[in-house]
Amino acid sequence: MAVISMKQLLEAGVHFGHQTRRWNPKMAPYIFTDRNGIYIIDLQKTVKKVEEAYNFIKQLAAEGETVLFVGTKKQAQEAVQEEAERCGMFYVNQRWLGGMLTNFQTIRRRIDRLQELEKMEENGSLEVLPKKEVAELMHEKEKLQKFLGGIKEMRRLPGALFVIDPRKERIAVAEARKLGIPIVAIVDTNCDPDEVDYVIPGNDDAIRAVRLLTAKMADAVLEGKQGEQLAE
């Protein structure tokens, strides 16, 4: 049983690449043709590549490793958060803060601060403080929650990154590469596939395309976790 069908990919518009004047020649092997100045991605290749990525993520999750979902562009934010939460993984969907991987200890301290503020809110210790101070602390908490909420429970570096648009998320990609963390990514016709370990050639701009492929990776995590439980 194929992980994904041509029909699903077509219906979600995964085959539409970027304009022909905005392309990376390294993506040539994944391009089927061009139509009205737009590259059309070879979906037969995408089907194969989705399967490879799916099996890799599934195996990773079965070994108890984690996946960090990264997509900060408008079209990706919602799918990234919802699908990562659905499979119990971590996500960054607002802004990649430099050092999120390479300076993880410092980021962890910011997360500890977020958790400290949450505790203060829960146990009522804010109630004794002046209103102005409470407002400042709440503002700090909201800001930390916005940028770090998706990695709050991440105690160590992830086993892999799943990235939507490695060109937009180039800082995340560079950090993962520096640390030898494998990268799975939706790679459009204007991206460099050499930066990515598991390339999924596809449209990274259409909400439906992003949602479909992100959901598939979340499914892989869930299937892998099931395997991990069975192994126990």
From Swiss-Prot:
Signal peptide: none
Keyword Magnesium annotated: no
Gene Ontology MF: a single term: structural constituent of ribosome
Superkingdom of the organism of origin: Bacteria
Keywords, sorted A to Z: Ribonucleoprotein, Ribosomal protein
GO biological process: translation
Matching InterPro entries: Ribosomal_uS2, Ribosomal_uS2_bac/mit/plastid, Ribosomal_uS2_CS, Ribosomal_uS2_flav_dom_sf
One Gene Ontology term, aspect cellular component: cytosolic small ribosomal subunit
One Pfam family from the record: Ribosomal_S2
NCBIfam families to which the protein is assigned, alphabetical: rpsB_bact
Family to which this protein belongs: Belongs to the universal ribosomal protein uS2 family.
Protein name per the record: Small ribosomal subunit protein uS2
Species annotation: Pelotomaculum thermopropionicum (strain DSM 13744 / JCM 10971 / SI)
